[in-house]
């Protein structure tokens, strides 16, 4: 279900403060976050955010077409390794 338009998009407070601080200093550095549910807002464009996948942090460069999406959409939490072989020898 989509978030109500009356409310602002959800962004974790600590993530928002880190991005705001970097924008004031006009610096670019990798921001590490565990907040996969945070919405990408326009002030994040141009930053690299390392999103937690459950095992590691995956650095993602935020571009303007990503605004409005969640951070977790760009960092997959699992790797599909393929289905089991349909080899007769493996069943015996």
From Swiss-Prot:
Taxonomic lineage from the root: Eukaryota, Viridiplantae, Streptophyta, Embryophyta, Tracheophyta
Protein function: Protein S19 forms a complex with S13 that binds strongly to the 16S ribosomal RNA.
Keywords: Plastid, Ribonucleoprotein, Ribosomal protein, RNA-binding, rRNA-binding
InterPro entries to which the protein is assigned, alphabetical: Ribosomal_uS19, Ribosomal_uS19_bac-type, Ribosomal_uS19_CS, Ribosomal_uS19_SF
Protein known as: Small ribosomal subunit protein uS19c
Keyword Transcription regulation in record: no
GO biological process: ribosomal small subunit assembly; translation
Gene Ontology molecular function, alphabetical: rRNA binding; structural constituent of ribosome
Pfam family, one: Ribosomal_S19
Organism listed in the record: Cuscuta exaltata (Tall dodder)
Gene3D superfamilies: 30s Ribosomal Protein S19, Chain A
Any one cellular-component term (Gene Ontology): plastid
Coiled-coil annotated spans: none
Family statement: Belongs to the universal ribosomal protein uS19 family.
Localization per Swiss-Prot or TrEMBL: Plastid
């Amino acid at each position: 279900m989509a978030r109500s338009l009356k409310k602002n998009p959800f962004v974790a407070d600590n993530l928002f403060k880190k991005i705001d601080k970097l924008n004031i200093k006009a610096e670019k550095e990798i921001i590490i976050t565990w907040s996969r549910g945070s919405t990408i807002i326009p002030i994040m464009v141009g930053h690299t955010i390392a999103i937690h996948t459950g095992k590691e942090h995956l650095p993602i460069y935020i571009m303007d077409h990503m605004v409005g999406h969640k951070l977790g959409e760009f960092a997959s939490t699992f790797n599909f390794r393929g289905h089991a072989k349909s080899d007769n020898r493996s069943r015996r």
